[in-house]
Curated annotation (Swiss-Prot):
Disulfide bonds: none annotated. GO terms for biological process: lipid transport; lipoprotein metabolic process; negative regulation of cholesterol transport; negative regulation of lipid catabolic process; negative regulation of very-low-density lipoprotein particle clearance; triglyceride metabolic process; very-low-density lipoprotein particle clearance. One of its GO terms (molecular function) is fatty acid binding. It comes from Chlorocebus pygerythrus. Residues 1-26 form the signal peptide. Keywords: Lipid transport, Secreted, Signal, Transport. Belongs to the apolipoprotein C1 family. The gene is APOC1B. Pfam families: ApoC-I (PF04691). InterPro entries: ApoC-1_sf (IPR043081), ApoC-I (IPR006781). This is Apolipoprotein C-I, basic form. The keyword Transport applies.
Length: 65
């Protein structure tokens, strides 16, 4: 009975080993990563300028002088 159950398991394991390594999942593209980084930088810059302009237009600088 043990031999009867272990043979199918052995066949499955052997087929998995002989199949070889799995193909790599989509390799990350360097240019798309750089584009995302550039977009993030531009967004951050826009938000920073927005905050600076809001501070300049507020009464806070006049009150602190």
């Amino acid at each position: 009975m043990r031999l009867f159950l272990s043979l199918p398991v052995l066949v499955v394991v052997l087929s998995m080993v002989l199949e070889g390594p799995a193909p790599a999942q989509g390799a990350p593209d360097v240019s798309s990563a750089l584009d995302k980084l550039k977009e993030f930088g531009n967004t951050l810059e826009d938000k920073a300028w927005e905050v600076i302009n809001r501070i300049k237009q507020s009464e806070l600088p006049a009150k602190t002088r």
